[in-house]
C-alpha cells in the first residue's frame, strides 16, 4: 500500500463518496474511476522514499483508513458491549493524533460536567456516580455512566474536534 497526501478539498470529495464503514480508499477510488482490479495493475506508481512513520503525522486520509481497519477487524467485531467499542475507538483516536485528542478532550464537556480528564479525581468531583474509566493506552479518563446515545455523541464530537469530517464522525459513532 502506498501513502498519498491529498489536499482538504479533494479529501472531502473522496470521503463524501464512502458508501459503508470499512470501505478502503482504494475501493472508493476504483468505484469512482470505474477501475477493475485488472486495470489497477496497469497503473504505474512512482516509488516514494521510505519515511519513518514516527516522524510523520498521520494524514487525515490515512487516519480514516486506520479507523476503517479497526472497525472491520475481528477485535472490534468481538466487542459485545458498547463501552468496550467506545473505549477501543477512543484509544485508537489517541494513537492517531495525541495532541488533537488532548485539545478535543479538554474542550468537550456537558452543561454541568466534564466528559474527559487526565485525572480520575477531577471527574469524580463532578459526581461520584460518573464511573470514570481510564482509556486504554492513554493518560485520559472518561465518564462511563452515560447511555449509549450520549457515548455516540461524545465520540462524534471528539472526532469533529479532531478535524474528522462530520459524515465520517457520524458513521463511526453509529457503530458503537
From Swiss-Prot:
GO terms for molecular function: sequence-specific DNA binding. It comes from the Bacteria. It holds the Pfam family SeqA. It is found in: Cytoplasm. SUPFAM superfamilies: Replication modulator SeqA, C-terminal DNA-binding domain, Ribbon-helix-helix. GO terms for cellular component: cytoplasm. GO terms for biological process: negative regulation of DNA-templated DNA replication initiation; regulation of DNA-templated transcription. Keywords: Cytoplasm, DNA replication inhibitor, DNA-binding. Signal peptide: none annotated. Belongs to the SeqA family. Negative regulator of replication initiation, which contributes to regulation of DNA replication and ensures that replication initiation occurs exactly once per chromosome per cell cycle. Binds to pairs of hemimethylated GATC sequences in the oriC region, thus preventing assembly of replication proteins and re-initiation at newly replicated origins. Repression is relieved when the region becomes fully methylated. Homodimer. Polymerizes to form helical filaments. HAMAP family: SeqA. This is Negative modulator of initiation of replication.
Amino acid at each position: 500500500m502506498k501513502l498519498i497526501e491529498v489536499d482538504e478539498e479533494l479529501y472531502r470529495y473522496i470521503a463524501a463518496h464512502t458508501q459503508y464503514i470499512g470501505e478502503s480508499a482504494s475501493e472508493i477510488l476504483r468505484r469512482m474511476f470505474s477501475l477493475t482490479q485488472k486495470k489497477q495493475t496497469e497503473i504505474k506508481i512512482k516509488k516514494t522514499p521510505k519515511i519513518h512513520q514516527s516522524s510523520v503525522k498521520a494524514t487525515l486520509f490515512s487516519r480514516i483508513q486506520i479507523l476503517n481497519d479497526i472497525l472491520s477487524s475481528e477485535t472490534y467485531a468481538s466487542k459485545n458491549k458498547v463501552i468496550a467499542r467506545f473505549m477501543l475507538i477512543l484509544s485508537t483516536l489517541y494513537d492517531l493524533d495525541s495532541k488533537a485528542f488532548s485539545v478535543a478532550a479538554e474542550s468537550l464537556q456537558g452543561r454541568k460536567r466534564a466528559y474527559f480528564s487526565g485525572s480520575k479525581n477531577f471527574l469524580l468531583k463532578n459526581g461520584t456516580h460518573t464511573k470514570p474509566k481510564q482509556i486504554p493506552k492513554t493518560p485520559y479518563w472518561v465518564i462511563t455512566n452515560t447511555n449509549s446515545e450520549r457515548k455516540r455523541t461524545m465520540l462524534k464530537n471528539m472526532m469533529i474536534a479532531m478535524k474528522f469530517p462530520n459524515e465520517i464522525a457520524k458513521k463511526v459513532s453509529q457503530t458503537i
